[in-house]
């Protein structure tokens, strides 16, 4: 008999402000990381993951609810304060949880980071990845800025 894996609903409430700006559910921020991409990184850990891996490094990020909601502008302003530490190879890494669950935010955030010449990295298991439909269209857009 095969065990059924439960479906986990992703909480999509409060992901956009009244003015249309996307909000990220942020778990935590590391301002000086050296293992999550090239050079010195500003690392953003987003909330939400449906995989529940037994040996997950960040199980506290699984839950999608967060008291820390931030716009791309707010998060980028916080990151840019540390830009002088990044050197030529550093930048911003977004991790999680599963970062692709907040795709709309990522597109906006990485687009704004690239406009300021910031190197970006995405840490993902790609679990929600689909090579069809709206997801793939958004993923292709995100890759332009990653």
Question: Model segments located where?
Answer:
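N-terminal [4Fe-4S]-dependent radical SAM core
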Residues: 1-45, 52-66, 81-88
